[in-house]
């Protein structure tokens, strides 16, 4: 039943994504983190201690609520248990919502104004976007799709196979903390330290699996697989995070473009190394290719994880 539940969760994610009006665990996590940060602004606790408290309570709540919901559902009826299981699993995946948001940036670049495109990309990236050029908007979108292929899809999918929705929701809490407070700016450097470090740890394996799946997907989509391999290997550590460049490097190599470089976060210029080679301008159409890589790597991961799961079930 576990395999069927995972496949149904992936199917639901691909079909409906995350409608804005629907309740969603990650939204609740984000609201809790936001409220805690408002409290910190008023009370000015020790930033390191508050950062630890924020991480511990957010992850603890995600773990505890997931366990509690499944336990209560199991007490009520086995069918309800699996319905809750599938919902939590579906909510942990973000392929459709990621592709949908990237598509909105693409359509705004192609058919809207530059100001609209800047606002649209600002919905999915943490950097300041008010001065971005069309090429920089395309780069930012591709970087987000590439990085979140690991954080938003392959990582949760791996967790579902290893520990079900409880592990997947715990993983999502760790990711959400990093995305909200894990910055190196003056405001977040101390508060977000533990969130950033724990996110690095949680994504060590998913990032490297995503690297492999993206290379395989580059071959399936008849992209530059040699470039994906070469740049993917050469530039896999060209990032402050030990994980983020793994997926970005493969995508940059497969598309023959350059990503990365300095960005402005919360009013501060943060220097970042470049990834890939500046062989041609980055275009809006490259966003579509990045989305194709997202979906293909998701299917590749699902197939390979399933095969591994079946082998483990047969022999252990």
Swiss-Prot record:
Organism: Streptococcus sanguinis (strain SK36)
GO cellular component: plasma membrane
The name this protein goes by in its record: Cobalamin biosynthesis protein CobD
Localization per Swiss-Prot or TrEMBL: Cell membrane
Residue stretches spanning the membrane: 45-65, 78-100, 151-171, 209-229, 291-311
Function: Converts cobyric acid to cobinamide by the addition of aminopropanol on the F carboxylic group.
Pathway membership, UniProt: Cofactor biosynthesis; adenosylcobalamin biosynthesis
BP terms from Gene Ontology: cobalamin biosynthetic process
Keyword Transmembrane: yes
Keyword field: Cell membrane, Cobalamin biosynthesis, Membrane, Transmembrane, Transmembrane helix
InterPro entries, per database record: Cobalamin_biosynth_CobD/CbiB (IPR004485)
Membrane disposition: Multi-pass membrane protein
Gene Ontology molecular function terms on file: ABC-type vitamin B12 transporter activity; threonine-phosphate decarboxylase activity
Phylogenetic classification of the source organism: Bacteria, Bacillati, Bacillota, Bacilli, Lactobacillales
């Amino acid at each position: 039943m576990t395999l069927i539940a995972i496949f149904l969760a992936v199917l639901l994610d691909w079909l409906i994504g995350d409608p804005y009006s629907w309740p969603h665990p990650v939204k609740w996590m984000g609201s809790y983190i936001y409220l805690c940060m408002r409290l910190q602004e008023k009370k000015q606790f020790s930033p390191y201690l508050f950062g630890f408290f924020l991480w511990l309570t957010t992850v603890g709540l995600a773990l505890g609520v997931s366990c509690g919901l499944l336990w209560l559902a199991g007490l009520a009826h086995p069918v309800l248990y699996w319905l809750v299981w599938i919902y939590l699993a579906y909510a942990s995946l973000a392929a459709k919502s990621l592709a949908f948001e990237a598509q909105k940036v693409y359509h705004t670049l192609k058919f809207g104004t530059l100001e609209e495109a800047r606002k649209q990309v600002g919905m999915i990236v943490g950097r300041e976007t008010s001065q971005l050029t069309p090429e920089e908007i395309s780069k930012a979108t591709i970087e987000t799709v590439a990085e979140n292929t690991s954080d938003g899809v392959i990582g949760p999918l791996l967790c579902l196979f290893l520990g079900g929705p409880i592990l997947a929701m715990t993983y999502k809490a760790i990711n959400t903390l990093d995305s909200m407070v894990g910055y190196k700016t003056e405001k977040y450097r101390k508060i977000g330290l533990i969130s950033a470090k724990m996110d690095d740890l949680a994504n060590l394996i998913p990032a490297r699996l995503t690297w492999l799946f993206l290379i395989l997907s580059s071959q399936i989509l008849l992209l530059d697989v040699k470039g994906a391999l070469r740049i993917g290997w050469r530039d896999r550590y060209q990032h402050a995070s030990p994980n983020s460049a793994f997926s970005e490097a493969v995508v940059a190599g497969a598309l023959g473009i350059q990503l990365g470089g300095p960005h402005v976060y919360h009013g501060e210029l943060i220097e970042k190394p470049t990834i890939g080679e500046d062989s041609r301008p980055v275009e809006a159409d490259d966003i579509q290719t990045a989305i194709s890589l997202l979906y293909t790597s998701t299917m590749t991961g699902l197939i390979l994880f399933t095969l591994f799961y079946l082998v483990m079930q047969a022999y252990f």
